[in-house]
UniProtKB/Swiss-Prot annotation:
It is an enzyme of class 3 (hydrolase). The modification Omega-N-methylarginine is found at residue 492. Belongs to the heat shock protein 70 family. This is Endoplasmic reticulum chaperone BiP. InterPro entries: ATPase_NBD, BIP_NBD, Heat_shock_70_CS, HSP70_C_sf, HSP70_peptide-bd_sf, Hsp_70_fam. The modification Phosphoserine is found at residues 86, 649. In unstressed cells, AMPylation at Thr-518 by FICD inactivates the chaperome activity: AMPylated form is locked in a relatively inert state and only weakly stimulated by J domain-containing proteins. In response to endoplasmic reticulum stress, de-AMPylation by the same protein, FICD, restores the chaperone activity. The modification N6-succinyllysine is found at residue 447. ATP binds at residues 36-39, 96, 227-229, 293-300, 364-367. It comes from Cricetulus griseus.
Amino acid sequence: MKFPMVAAALLLLCAVRAEEEDKKEDVGTVVGIDLGTTYSCVGVFKNGRVEIIANDQGNRITPSYVAFTPEGERLIGDAAKNQLTSNPENTVFDAKRLIGRTWNDPSVQQDIKFLPFKVVEKKTKPYIQVDIGGGQTKTFAPEEISAMVLTKMKETAEAYLGKKVTHAVVTVPAYFNDAQRQATKDAGTIAGLNVMRIINEPTAAAIAYGLDKREGEKNILVFDLGGGTFDVSLLTIDNGVFEVVATNGDTHLGGEDFDQRVMEHFIKLYKKKTGKDVRKDNRAVQKLRREVEKAKRALSSQHQARIEIESFFEGEDFSETLTRAKFEELNMDLFRSTMKPVQKVLEDSDLKKSDIDEIVLVGGSTRIPKIQQLVKEFFNGKEPSRGINPDEAVAYGAAVQAGVLSGDQDTGDLVLLDVCPLTLGIETVGGVMTKLIPRNTVVPTKKSQIFSTASDNQPTVTIKVYEGERPLTKDNHLLGTFDLTGIPPAPRGVPQIEVTFEIDVNGILRVTAEDKGTGNKNKITITNDQNRLTPEEIERMVNDAEKFAEEDKKLKERIDTRNELESYAYSLKNQIGDKEKLGGKLSSEDKETMEKAVEEKIEWLESHQDADIEDFKAKKKELEEIVQPIISKLYGSAGPPPTGEEDTSEKDEL
């Protein structure tokens, strides 16, 4: 006889207050992070309000990109995305499309066709293989890449707050299953963050929205269409209490899919016009991706956009126009498909269109005019709410929840109830799906049921855990399998085995089984966990992450020291060659000595780009020891020689 494990229940967001206050550990300032497929965003609850924090480039959203340069430097965020076209094979993005999934997952197989970097199979999971500089190849788990993005968000918050950040609330799509949620928590651990809560993106958006809408009961529909995922949630908000009534969506629909359609259109068009297939040139495809994304954004506010790419392919330029009408035509089936989950959510919550009080649009893709029009038409002309920046709403809500967990009183009596998005059940004789937890059950939840053996003296039962709505398990999604062994010999149907499913506040499942006859209790490990990182792997990845940070620091120091020597040598060279300045004041002997010393160092630099910090420092000191006495003699003082830094400001005085 067989059973199943719980899906990705939607997280409960329980904003507890005074009763936890006494026993709460000091967690410092907890940050809220929207770890997105394409962009990430971080916020903090401070002085009674949410601050969305800008990164070092001044941007409030950061690309979820990590790159490794040929020089061995690691770039994260804007810097990584900006060099995508020149280094596509070693620029990693869309890690969220791979996290917590198995190699054989059809969506993984579909995705890797379009990713410019190499994805390989390791321990039945997709791993990312890149050249990290110096001819070294390294494979990373998707969790490690996500951890690097989380580290960037953590550092962004630390720079703003002026102190260390150790605890966070991180958001995931409502449809993420157990493995994907666990993998996201693991990414936090690797980044040195204690992820206190995993919360659903639409839930977070509802919190952001709910803060200023506190009177009476309201039905809110959250329509969240981002770069990689689509979620629809129906929430009721009553005096600060949120309840997620129903959710639906598509884990694999978003802005990137719209870009892909446009790219395919232009690749075909280019082949038709020139007979050339650009697909085989990664760099050309990435250039096109970048320009198509820009054009798509422009079309939200204008009716046509020009796509110009210099030396696009084999030295030829690319120049085409994309109209809003063409963009809509290429994606119309995808746009229309977003209405199905909206319909489903209304059916699940027994509500009519007219019962919806507010429609909240979240995610950058909801800026597309056609999407806004379809939503408005679906709700018979009702205008969606525009009170929230769609890029920041999720991080905003996560920051409010983080404020609650920090013990910040200003968030008030905010409570949020969440639900399990799919029915969870087990397989019983004949491949029947026996339901344990119906979809849209509020979590956290715990359900138990008694099962028995299917044959005489059966020592083991195999339990298969499924999620889905179909009556037969073959049509549903297998989440995991485990065995309960050591059942004493008995006729079929006699042993009583109590199986308990428990979903915690993060929507993560625990399964316990108890043989009622013997009182033997076993905690069951779902084989799904085998796709998770082991504690040892996580520890190794944490160490790797620390090592990377250390290497990044060392590399920067080395580059800075090299630059100091270089600018010092060139500054001297320029001044010696300038008759108005140092060149006109030196004796020919001193001039020759200095010129020779400077040339030696410049030649040495050209052939020793990869020297150690100590070598650069030593060479600079050697040069100073030759130059210093000459300059001192010239000025009759023991003042320091001109340095590279002084070059710009002190130049005129020499």
